[in-house]
Amino acid sequence: MTASLRRPATLLTIGQLCREFDVTPRTLRYYEEQGLLAPERREQQRLYSRRDRARLQLILRGRRVGLSLAQIRQVLDLHNPADQDAA
């Protein structure tokens, strides 16, 4: 059985998430560097949860309406204040 068949359906690889949202892997890595996304890491692979998918959706919507990444971070913090406690 391949790793992709054993992986729970709720986790997406960087390639799968890129295809779903029509973004580049570099974009996702940049959002991770900026602290906007925090994918699970298994060895050298990033795995994105449903939560990461929802956060990316909010990030992209914010960018479409002209928000800066700092403004988007504030929106994400309001959307999930538990993240602030972990930081």
List the model feature ranges, each with a label.
Residues 45:
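Conserved catalytic core of two-component sensor histidine kinases, primarily the HATPase_c ATP-binding
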Residues 35:
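Glycine-centered, phosphate/nucleic-acid-interacting loop/turn motifs that mediate DNA/RNA or nucleotide
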